[in-house]
Each structure stands twice: as C-alpha cells, then as structure tokens.
Amino acid sequence: MKGQRNIGMVAHDERKEDLLDWVQHNLQALIPHRIFATGTTGGLLRQRFGDLTITPMKSGPLGGDQQLGSMIAEGRLDMLFFLIDPMAPHPHDVDIKALLRLAVLYNIPAAYNRSTADFLITSPFMTGEYIPEIKDYTPYVKRLGAK
C-alpha cells in the first residue's frame, strides 16, 4: 500500500471526544485519506471535519464493527484507529473482539489508544510504501476441507 489509505475509525462513547480532539490535531495528515467510521463516530466526524472524506457505516452495535471487519477481510481497509473505553461494559463485546481479531489476523496497523494512534499517524509508512506481511493460512484452510 502506498499513498492514500482507507482508514477505519471507531470510538466508544466515552472516547468520542478524545478521537475528535486527536483528529483535529492530525487533520492535515488525515485529509489525503479515506475514513470509514461506525455510525455515531462517523456522524460526529462529518459534522466537525468537512475537509475529510468520511463514509459512515452502521452504528457499532447494529453491525458497523462487522462492516469494518468485512472490509479488513476483503483487503479494503488499510488501518484501524479504535479508541476503546476499557472501563465500560459493551453489550456488543463479541463484535468488538471479532473486529480486533481480524485486524490482527490480516496484520493491519491498529491503534487502540491515543499514544499508538500518534505513532501510526507520524510513521513514514503512513504515506510511503508499506507491504504488510500476510500469514499464509492455506494449511489451515486445507485441513478443514474448505476452499
């Protein structure tokens, strides 16, 4: 991947303002990229940052996390910024875990807190050439008899 990135953005309710502050701080770095965000997060981003290309998905609990996960599995999402609230229970916790698992499985850069997001956005790989190593799962697939 090089140049324009497809970026997933999610923030739990108690972290939405943190994400908005982070985006404001990094606005110029984000303008060249396409953002795909879960429902409420995407709506807030659109209201505040008209310069960004934002595609809102469904709300996380209504399938938005799974939509982003599908994009990862299909190779259509290059990185994920997901500001997680570790202090609150989430009724759709299984969806969140599935999204995080896919980010790990397909080896896309993912930030779950602001510090890691800062490291990713300032990395030379953000706009430069980067080809993530993808593990070959062929033996696993063949073991199950699937195609």
From Swiss-Prot:
The EC number(s) this enzyme carries: 4.2.3.3
User: Which keywords accompany this UniProt record?
Assistant: Lyase
> Molecular function (GO) terms listed?
methylglyoxal synthase activity
Residues annotated as binding substrate are H12, K16, T38, G39, T40, T41, S59, G60, H92
Recorded GO CC terms: cytosol
Which residues act catalytically here? D65 (proton donor/acceptor)
Q: Which PROSITE patterns match?
A: METHYLGLYOXAL_SYNTH, MGS
Q: Which Pfam families match?
A: MGS
Reaction catalysed?
dihydroxyacetone phosphate = methylglyoxal + phosphate
The record's listing under InterPro entries reads:
Methylgl_synth, Methylglyoxal_synth_AS, MGS-like_dom, MGS-like_dom_sf
Classification via SUPFAM superfamilies: Methylglyoxal synthase-like (SSF52335)
Q: Which Gene Ontology BP terms does the record give? A: methylglyoxal biosynthetic process
PANTHER family hit by this protein: METHYLGLYOXAL SYNTHASE
Q: What job does the chain carry out?
A: Catalyzes the formation of methylglyoxal from dihydroxyacetone phosphate.
Q: What is this protein called?
A: Methylglyoxal synthase
Naturally occurring in which organism (per UniProt): Oleidesulfovibrio alaskensis (strain ATCC BAA-1058 / DSM 17464 / G20) (Desulfovibrio alaskensis)
Name of the gene this protein is made from: mgsA
